[in-house]
């Protein structure tokens, strides 16, 4: 049984006005499901069920069982549109998962052993919070682990420094973009402190 499930209903009343009415009057989130060998479907889901699902970070990078009017299909979250001030989900895009067919997904990054470079006097800057990956559905990781145990002051951790899980490829690297993920730098000194030190 899939731990990540959502119930939805097909909707025929489309357009921005219809979506606003769904959110305002029925506390529903409009969404679209596409991909695979089926036509796109416009659906709606209870806002409270969507919010509850997203309380678990793993839902963003996990195969979700979507029950649309009694028909179940496996999907992943492709995009979420949130309210700019309140943060709740206003619209969602889902992509169907096809067994044996590679998919791309956004996976959160987990940094571990951050205390090691801090003990050496360094400060850590996280450059990214998530990484786009390509893999088969069965290989989709819940997160990508970045180990900073051996990082020194001046270290820049790039995608190529991270060991990808078996069967997983970093999309940016495949396109020649070895982007920075994190860096360790010396503590920044306030201008006032620098001037006082020079005066002494």
Curated annotation (Swiss-Prot):
Secretion signal, residue range per the UniProt entry: none
Pfam families tied to this protein: Ribosomal_L25p, Ribosomal_TL5_C
Entry superkingdom: Bacteria
Keywords: Ribonucleoprotein, Ribosomal protein, RNA-binding, rRNA-binding
Subunit structure: Part of the 50S ribosomal subunit; part of the 5S rRNA/L5/L18/L25 subcomplex. Contacts the 5S rRNA. Binds to the 5S rRNA independently of L5 and L18.
Family listed: Belongs to the bacterial ribosomal protein bL25 family. CTC subfamily.
Function: This is one of the proteins that binds to the 5S RNA in the ribosome where it forms part of the central protuberance.
NCBIfam families per UniProt: bL25_bact_ctc, PRK05618.1-2, PRK05618.1-5, PRK05943.1
Protein known as: Large ribosomal subunit protein bL25
Lineage of source species: Bacteria, Pseudomonadati, Pseudomonadota, Gammaproteobacteria, Pseudomonadales
């Amino acid at each position: 049984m899939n731990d990540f499930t959502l119930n939805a209903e097909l909707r025929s009343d489309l357009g921005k006005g219809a979506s606003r009415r769904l959110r305002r009057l029925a506390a529903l989130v409009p969404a679209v499901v596409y991909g695979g060998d089926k036509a796109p479907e416009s659906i709606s889901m209870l806002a409270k069920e969507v919010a509850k699902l997203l309380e678990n970070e793993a839902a963003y990078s996990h195969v979700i069982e979507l029950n649309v009017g009694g028909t179940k299909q496996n999907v992943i979250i492709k995009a979420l549109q949130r309210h700019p001030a309140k943060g709740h989900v206003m619209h969602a895009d889902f992509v169907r998962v096809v067994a044996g067919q590679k998919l791309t997904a956004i996976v959160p990054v987990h940094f571990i052993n951050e205390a090691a470079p801090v003990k050496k006097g360094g400060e850590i800057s996280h450059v990214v919070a998530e990484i786009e990956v390509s893999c088969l559905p069965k290989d989709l990781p819940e997160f990508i682990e970045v180990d900073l145990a051996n990082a020194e002051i001046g270290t820049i951790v790039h995608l190529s420094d991270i060991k990808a899980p078996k069967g997983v490829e970093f999309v940016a690297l495949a396109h020649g973009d070895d982007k920075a993920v994190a860096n360790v730098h010396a503590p920044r000194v306030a201008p006032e402190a620098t001037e006082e030190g020079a005066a002494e």
